[in-house]
Amino acid sequence: MSDILDRIIAVKREEIAAALRSTPLEALKLEASARDLRDFVGALRAKHAAGNAAVIAEIKKASPSKGVLREHFVPADIARSYAAHGAACLSVLTDEQFFQGGVRYLEEARAACTLPVLRKDFIVDAYQIVEARAMGADAILLIAAALDTPLMQDLEAYAHSLGLAVLVEVHDRHEMEQALTLKTPLLGINNRNLRTFETSIQTTLDMLDMIPADRIVVTESGILSRTDVDTMRAANVNTFLVGEAFMRAEQPGEELARMFF
């Protein structure tokens, strides 16, 4: 695990302890049960069936490696723009300390459109999965670099029991082997090196030989141009999670359409 990931996970455990004190698990479960769900995987498959790229468009104000990406940050407006320009789903950062995200951003984005929403955070405990359901998420992220295989399997099973989709994220072939023990069809390959923070889309291409045909490869990070998109689609990678390229554009939805459609 990288130093930054170690620090983030330590903070997450502190946040979970504080959240449990303010909202016990059973109370949170009641909130979660009142939320409706949108079909995250189905939205991706519908784009594929129409011959299109399936874009999980990210709403992200900042990152540890790049700092603030977008000063004028109105999640509801960004969500509407993404929906109007062909996104399949949304991804919303809810981590506050490292990414300047927030639960309210996910709630605002989901209320502004009909797209399914991924809670983008560092999930290490079942409490966060109930939290995700309660805030209106339709899917969660599990990061293989942050979890051992048995815990990852347990968290996936719990998420599925609540009706949530799971995107499992890997950075290398060893993590892909772990991810392939899960049931989820969604395999995210993060092109960012966790130690150097550099990105290379070759990371995704180099792992395609490991992936069964019934899984959906989601390429993440470093997709910055139409050329990157074309390279991936030529390799039959048709699902993309993109944040930075859109967040830096004056009109995020228009940039999505320019890159993908």
Curated annotation (Swiss-Prot):
Domain of life according to the entry: Bacteria
Catalytic reaction annotation: 1-(2-carboxyphenylamino)-1-deoxy-D-ribulose 5-phosphate + H(+) = (1S,2R)-1-C-(indol-3-yl)glycerol 3-phosphate + CO2 + H2O
One Pfam assignment: IGPS
Gene3D superfamilies found in the cross-reference section: Aldolase class I
Enzyme class at the top of the EC tree: lyase
Alphabetized CDD domains for the sequence: IGPS
Pathway per the UniProt entry: Amino-acid biosynthesis; L-tryptophan biosynthesis; L-tryptophan from chorismate: step 4/5
EC number: 4.1.1.48
PROSITE patterns (alphabetical): IGPS (PS00614)
InterPro entries per the UniProt record, alphabetical: Aldolase_TIM, Indole-3-glycerol_P_synth, Indole-3-glycerol_P_synth_dom, Indole-3-GlycerolPSynthase_CS, RibuloseP-bd_barrel
GO MF annotation terms: indole-3-glycerol-phosphate synthase activity; phosphoribosylanthranilate isomerase activity
Keywords from the UniProt entry: Amino-acid biosynthesis, Aromatic amino acid biosynthesis, Decarboxylase, Lyase, Tryptophan biosynthesis
Biological process terms in GO annotation: L-tryptophan biosynthetic process
Membership in a protein family: Belongs to the TrpC family.
Name of the molecule in the record: Indole-3-glycerol phosphate synthase
Naturally occurring in which organism (per UniProt): Burkholderia cenocepacia (strain HI2424)
